[in-house]
């Protein structure tokens, strides 16, 4: 272990990618998962095209620079958590490693993350890129949910650390509810929810548009996003919240000021009901999506009920939040209250059906919030990749050359701290 450079930890998400080195508390770089490429008409003979293709392959920008590059088209290699375009992904990783981390890939082991239910073929593609293109000495592909569970140890004592729990991971593009038992994902019980950060932003945008508050149209999306991140919170009861705003508007309405990028004139927006209505779509999804009406608390409860009976109590006891869209004030408290309500109602019904003969043992529902929540997946990866065990479970370049990319289909669970 001595003299070895720290592992690189890269978590590529739908909206943002988190890059950094193992052992650090926070990622060194958080960049949008966007890439700007030149799209030219494919004309001319093959030789000319081959020459220009080599040049084109180097002519691209990623992250914030991608949005500033004029004359380029912006692409997103990841959609809803899954890699959609592997050529773009390879180019994206190339700049992540060389331009941002400024690392020599031959000298560092790598930990990459994958979404739940990622296909084994995708792991093979990842292995091919890392071993063939970057020539890395070792690679480990970790499931995001397991890393998020490990990150929650930051707020717990050593004897409470467990890799059994249910992860509510809500980012920009997708929300997953993932049950994990002893570090292994219970794949058949995972649920995906079509509501995440991007949907909240669009919903706030539409609420502001209805009021016609004088936001420049080309800035309406970024204004909605800024309002979401700065002013939104989760309320315990919508009706009471509306009443609060109506009786004391001065106390609750906030002011957001921005500058028109074209005319440079300042504009102001009064932010009222949007503050609590935006994130409320987690608990009342029908507000923004009439096709989907099941609240998040009910989905978490259903997922746990679908799991094997012997892990249900530990799952209720360790509901871990992860991702930027769980950062709203009082999100954890509201989720815990709603789940506790449905659990207690169920226990009461079973007691009534048995006419009092069966007294069910109360179920302890605990939603864990902690200070590393926003970058939980990256932080969990950073923690695990800084342990000596990490280097024992990594797939090495030698094994890859002997057996091929199929070795990366399985990545052993480690770090259960037993």
Swiss-Prot record:
Any coiled-coil regions, as ranges = none
UniProt-recorded Gene Ontology molecular function terms: actin binding; ATP binding; structural constituent of cytoskeleton
Example GO biological process term? Answer: chaeta development
What superkingdom heads the lineage?
Answer: Eukaryota
User: What InterPro entries does the entry give?
Assistant: Actin, Actin/actin-like_CS, ATPase_NBD
Q: Which Gene3D superfamilies match?
A: 3.30.420.40, Actin, Chain A, domain 4
Identify the SUPFAM superfamilies for this entry: Actin-like ATPase domain
Going by the UniProt record, its keywords in alphabetical order are: Actin-binding, ATP-binding, Cytoplasm, Cytoskeleton, Nucleotide-binding
Q: Name one GO cellular component term.
A: Arp2/3 protein complex
Q: Which Pfam family, any one, appears in the UniProt record?
A: Actin
Report the principal subcellular site.
cytoplasm
Entry's localization field: Cytoplasm, Cytoskeleton
Q: What does this protein do?
A: Functions as ATP-binding component of the Arp2/3 complex which is involved in regulation of actin polymerization and together with an activating nucleation-promoting factor (NPF) mediates the formation of branched actin networks. Seems to contact the pointed end of the daughter actin filament. Required during embryogenesis for the developmental migration of tail hemocytes anteriorly, along the ventral midline.
Q: How does it assemble?
A: Component of the Arp2/3 complex.
Say which family it is in: Belongs to the actin family. ARP3 subfamily.
According to UniProt, the name of this protein is Actin-related protein 3
Q: Which species expresses this protein natively?
A: Drosophila melanogaster
Q: Coding gene?
A: Arp3
């Amino acid at each position: 272990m001595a003299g070895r450079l720290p592992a690189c930890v890269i978590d590529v998400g739908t909206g943002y990618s988190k890059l950094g080195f193992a052992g650090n508390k926070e990622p060194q770089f958080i960049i949008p998962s966007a890439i700007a490429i030149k799209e030219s008409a494919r004309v001319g003979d093959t030789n000319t095209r081959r020459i220009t293709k080599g040049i084109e392959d180097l002519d691209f920008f990623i992250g914030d620079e991608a949005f500033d590059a004029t004359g380029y088209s912006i692409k997103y290699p990841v959609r809803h958590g899954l890699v959609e375009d592997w050529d773009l992904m390879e180019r994206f990783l190339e700049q992540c490693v060389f331009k941002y981390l400024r690392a020599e890939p031959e000298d560092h082991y790598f930990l990459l993350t994958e979404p739940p239910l990622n296909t084994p073929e995708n792991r093979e593609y990842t292995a091919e890129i890392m071993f063939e293109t970057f020539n890395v000495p070792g690679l480990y592909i970790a499931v995001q949910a397991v890393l998020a569970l490990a990150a929650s140890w930051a707020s717990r004592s050593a004897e409470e650390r467990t890799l059994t729990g249910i992860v509510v991971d809500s980012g920009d593009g997708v929300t997953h509810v993932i049950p994990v038992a002893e570090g292994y994902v219970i794949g058949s019980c995972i649920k995906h929810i079509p509501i995440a950060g991007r949907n909240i932003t669009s919903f706030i945008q539409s609420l502001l548009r209805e009021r016609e508050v004088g936001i420049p149209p080309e800035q309406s999306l970024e204004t909605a996003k800024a309002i979401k991140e700065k002013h939104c919170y989760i309320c315990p009861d919508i009706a009471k919240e509306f009443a609060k705003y109506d009786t004391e508007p001065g106390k609750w309405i906030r002011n957001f000021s921005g500058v028109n990028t074209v005319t440079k004139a300042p504009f102001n927006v009064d932010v009222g009901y949007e503050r609590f209505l935006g994130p409320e779509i987690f608990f009342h999804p029908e507000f923004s999506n009439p096709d989907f009406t099941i609240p998040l608390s009910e989905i978490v409860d259903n997922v746990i009920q679908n799991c094997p009976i012997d892990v249900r109590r530990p799952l209720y006891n360790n509901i871990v939040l992860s991702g930027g869209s769980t950062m709203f004030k009082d999100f954890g408290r509201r989720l815990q209250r709603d789940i506790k309500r449905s659990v207690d109602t169920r226990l009461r019904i079973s007691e009534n059906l048995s006419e009092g003969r069966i007294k069910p043992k109360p179920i302890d529902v605990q939603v864990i919030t902690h200070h590393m929540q926003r970058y939980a997946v990256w932080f969990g990866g950073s923690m695990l990749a800084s342990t000596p065990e990490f280097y024992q479970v990594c797939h090495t370049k030698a094994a890859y050359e002997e057996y091929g990319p199929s070795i990366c289909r399985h990545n052993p669970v480690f770090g259960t701290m037993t």
